[in-house]
Structure formats: structure tokens, C-alpha cells
Amino acid sequence: MRVGMRCYGQNDRSEFHCVGGEMIKYEIIDLHKIAIIGKEGLCTKEKNVVQDLWQQANSNFSDIADLGMKNADGSFVGFWGAMSDETLSFLPWTDDFSRGLYLAGVEVYEDTEVPDGWVKWVIPARKYLVTKITPESYGETFRNVINSLIPKLGMKLAGAVCDFTEPATGQNKLFFPVE
């Protein structure tokens, strides 16, 4: 078994900002490229397939469990809800962030072979604004970061947003590619 560890780059800063009445704690990090194997689908305003994709991935997880990158303690490094535009260029979703590709999956090594019925994405190394979320705060935090915090910091969204769950802690985070 190969053991992996996510190595974040240097933190530029970790700060709090009040945006839209919500206190948002965030940090800016550099993250190496990320490989994910999961179930892929197209989301639109008319049909959000995110929950269906997670259901498919979870129901068939035994197919890929041995492929997932693990920490030294045997826990998985992380589960990603990765997003991309329809060209798979990892640009932001279109149609007011309602249309794009979504991949529900587990982080793997880049050279991992993809089993039949699964898809692998390799997201390029980037700078991210990262903030912790809860299921209840997801929508409001997403909108506040996109519409207020990123512009307030003099930055711009540079790609599709991804959500991340760290199984060891149960912590959920949003990763906003910025420049």
C-alpha cells in the first residue's frame, strides 16, 4: 500500500473577513495537482445530478477503495466533489454557476489505472482560497466568497470550485481557484 500525504504550499495568510453578515475564515494555499477517480455527470439548472453521483460513487465504492490515496493511519486522504466547465478545462461553471461537469470521487495517485465505469480527472496545480463549510452554510458561503470576498481581496476566480471532505476529521471545505 502506498501512503500519500497532501502537502500544502506555504500559507500566504489565514484570516477572517465579514462578508454579507457572515464571518468567513479562509486561507490562501498552493496545492499540487490532484488526481480523482469517481462518477461524472453534467449538472444544469434543470437537473442537478450531484446527489445522484455521490449515491453511485458510494454504492460502488468497493470497486475503487483499494485505489484511494491513504494517510499513514490508513484513512483516506480525501473525497472530492470536483467541478469543471464542459470542455474539462477546469474553468468555472457557466449559466450563473449552475451548468458544468461534476466528479464525485476519491483522491488517488496520478498514475492510478481507472477501472471500467469510473472516470479520472487530474486537476492542475493552483493557488486556492480555502474555507471550511457545513452543509447548511454551503450555498451562502459559496455566494459570499464568489461575489464579495474574492473581489474584496483584489483577486479573481481562476477556475472551477471544488468541495473536499477530509474523512479523518469529517471537515468539509470549499476550494476556490484564485489569481
Where are the predicted features?
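A solvent-exposed interaction/effector surface
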Residues: 4, 8-179
